[in-house]
């Protein structure tokens, strides 16, 4: 069975690799391990790391799913996030708005809604 230490080691290893699809794949695996383990703090931490890996690895659209998961979790259970994680989530929010704004399939109204939500955050 995968342990908390296994997950933390995987995140550290992925972080040391730099950015790119291989890193994203390793972090995505850590997310699935954290889900199986069921520890909420690890579920949050791994998704923050996955969002970052996708954003830094030139896979910005893939970052939206783990970002939205964390945003919803923060709205329901803010106590799961420490101050540094809240700042990271805020940064991810800014990047998500920029990614949405750059997509011609996302309406201007939707982008404005996202911007308003970011301001409220």
Describe the predicted segments one by one.
Residues 1-14, 40-53, 80-102:
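Amphipathic alpha-helical repeat scaffolds of TPR domains
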Residues 12-17, 34-35:
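A ubiquitous short alpha-helical element
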Residues 15-29, 56-75, 102-120:
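Helix-turn-helix repeat elements of alpha-solenoid scaffolds
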Residues 24-34, 42-57:
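Internal alpha-helical scaffold/solenoid segments in large eukaryotic proteins
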Residues 32-43, 73-87, 117-121:
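Flexible helix-coil transition and linker loops at the boundaries of alpha-helical arrays
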């Amino acid at each position: 069975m995968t342990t908390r230490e296994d997950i933390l080691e995987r995140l550290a290893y992925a972080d040391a690799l730099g950015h790119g699809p291989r890193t994203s794949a390793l972090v995505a695996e850590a997310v699935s391990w954290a889900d199986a383990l069921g520890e909420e703090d690890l579920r949050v931490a791994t998704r923050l790391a996955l969002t970052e890996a996708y954003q830094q690895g030139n896979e910005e659209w893939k970052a939206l799913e783990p970002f939205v998961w964390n945003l919803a979790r923060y709205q329901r259970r803010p106590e799961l996030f420490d101050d540094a994680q809240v700042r990271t989530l805020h940064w991810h929010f800014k990047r998500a708005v920029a990614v949405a704004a750059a997509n011609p399939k996302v309406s201007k109204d939707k982008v404005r809604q996202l911007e308003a939500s970011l301001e409220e955050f």
